[in-house]
Amino acid sequence: MKVTLIAILTCAAVLVLHTTAAEELEAESQLMEVGMPDTELAAVDEERLFECSVSCEIGKEGNKDCKKKKCKGGWKCKFNMCVKV
């Protein structure tokens, strides 16, 4: 009886692990298909850095601290400009 129970639980655990691994692989493959090439990502990062820097400078006018202007999308305000986190 114990052996049967152990075998059933082992099979269930293997099935769960296999299903989880398969889902992760499927998600990775979809990201690779939909994802942008590295050069396009770099261009987006440069544009975001420029936009955030300008936003921080605008927010700094009138003795306002740059940190009051919140940067979005994985960026934070540092050294009077937004930087990628």
UniProtKB/Swiss-Prot annotation:
Q: Where is the signal peptide?
A: 1-22
InterPro entries, sorted:
Hwtx-2-like
Query: Which organs or tissues contain this protein?
Result: Expressed by the venom gland.
Q: Name one GO molecular function term.
A: toxin activity
| UniProt keyword annotation of Signal present | yes
Disulfide-bond pairs as recorded: 52-66, 56-77, 71-82
| Sorted UniProt keywords | Disulfide bond, Neurotoxin, Postsynaptic neurotoxin, Secreted, Signal, Toxin
Instruction: Kindly indicate whether the keyword Cell membrane belongs to this entry.
Output: no
The propeptide sits at 23-48
Location in or out of the cell: Secreted
GO cellular-component term (any): host cell postsynaptic membrane
Q: Could you tell me which SUPFAM superfamilies the record lists for this protein?
A: omega toxin-like (SSF57059)
Q: Where are the transmembrane segments?
A: none
Which Pfam family, an example, fits this chain? Toxin_20
**What family does the database annotate?**
Belongs to the neurotoxin 12 (Hwtx-2) family. 02 (Hwtx-2) subfamily.
Tell me, in a sentence or two, what this protein's role is. Postsynaptic neurotoxin.
Indicate what this protein is called per its UniProt record. U4-theraphotoxin-Hhn1j
